[in-house]
Amino acid sequence: MANIKSQIKRNKTNEKARLRNKSVKSSLKTAIRKAREAAAAGDVEKATEFQRVASRELDKAVSKGVIHKNQAANKKSALAQKVGALKG
């Protein structure tokens, strides 16, 4: 346990941020999984919709500082490839 007052405060804010980041990451994983599963099932319409939702979630996570923008770009690109393969 920290003895310094400022470090005690930092520990509290770090814990709040950890929980917030955990929530964002969890919803992000769910959105990506739904898009992947729809693409695997061959449902073009659902896959397209879920891809759009996942892209939005990824962008939000980047703006909140939860993930790096390059990681989001890679994930969006991979999803787009899977959905594009269904369409094309």
Swiss-Prot record:
RNA-binding as UniProt keyword = yes
Q: Please give the name of this protein.
A: Small ribosomal subunit protein bS20
An example of a GO molecular function for this protein is: structural constituent of ribosome
* InterPro entries per the UniProt record, alphabetical: Ribosomal_bS20, Ribosomal_bS20_sf
Q: Which GO terms describe its cellular component?
A: cytosol; small ribosomal subunit
The processes (GO biological process) annotated in the record are: translation
Is the keyword RNA-binding in the record? yes
Family, according to the entry, reads as follows: Belongs to the bacterial ribosomal protein bS20 family.
Query: What is the role of this chain?
Result: Binds directly to 16S ribosomal RNA.
UniProt keywords (A-Z) are: Ribonucleoprotein, Ribosomal protein, RNA-binding, rRNA-binding
* Species this chain originates from: Streptomyces coelicolor (strain ATCC BAA-471 / A3(2) / M145)
* Xref: SUPFAM superfamilies: Ribosomal protein S20
Identify the taxonomic lineage of the organism of origin. Bacteria, Bacillati, Actinomycetota, Actinomycetes, Kitasatosporales
Could you tell me which residues belong to the region Disordered?
Answer: 1-30
